[in-house]
């Protein structure tokens, strides 16, 4: 599946100037998408006002794309259909919150912009909107169909909800 998806994203990058599955979760502040595979797609993202990018996949974006720019960047090494640890999820959510608080719009992406992207966006909702994991998954799936693709990701979000409750005590 990944090879087919990668081929699709490369083809999409040749005929479109935007990454697959781009949408705002919070207009002008927080977005999700698939992997920007060309520099034109990367530029399109920046033209939308994105000032910070969180990559949630095995390989980071090309470092030369950031040369001379004022873009903040975080790479979370997470395998396809996997989920970050509780600590890494919390670090990502805090990073996103800090950037949004500094008026820097954030893009979260993985390869397809669904599973890992959806998990990080749902984790943000759990912490910042005080939602349960179930509510956050339902909300992100309504906004971005196909989000949170695996039991591993669903379980990680349930554990993250519990992790946050324990941290508050």
Model-derived regions: residue spans:
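Cys-dependent protein tyrosine phosphatase-like superfamily
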Residues: 1-107, 120-169
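Ser/Thr-glycine-rich phosphate-binding loops at phosphate-binding pockets of nucleotides
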Residues: 117
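Conserved G/P- and acidic residue-centered "switch" motifs that form tight phosphate/ATP-binding loops
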Residues: 113
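Short cysteine clusters
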Residues: 110
């Amino acid at each position: 599946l990944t090879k087919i998806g990668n081929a699709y994203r490369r083809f999409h990058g040749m005929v479109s100037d935007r990454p697959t599955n781009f949408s705002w979760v919070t207009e002008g502040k927080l977005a999700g998408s698939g992997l920007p595979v060309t520099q034109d797609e990367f530029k399109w993202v920046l033209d939308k006002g994105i000032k910070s990018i969180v990559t949630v996949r095995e390989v980071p974006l090309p470092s030369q794309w950031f040369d001379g720019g004022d873009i903040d960047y975080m790479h979370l090494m997470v395998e396809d259909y996997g989920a970050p640890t509780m600590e890494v999820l919390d670090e990502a959510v805090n990073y996103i919150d800090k950037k949004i608080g500094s008026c820097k719009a954030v893009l979260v992406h993985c390869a397809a912009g669904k599973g890992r992207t959806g998990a990080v966006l749902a984790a943000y909702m759990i912490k910042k909107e005080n939602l349960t994991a179930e509510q956050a998954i339902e909300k992100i799936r309504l906004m971005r169909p196909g989000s949170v693709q695996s039991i591993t990701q669903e379980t990680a979000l349930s554990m993250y909800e519990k992790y946050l409750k324990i941290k508050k005590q």
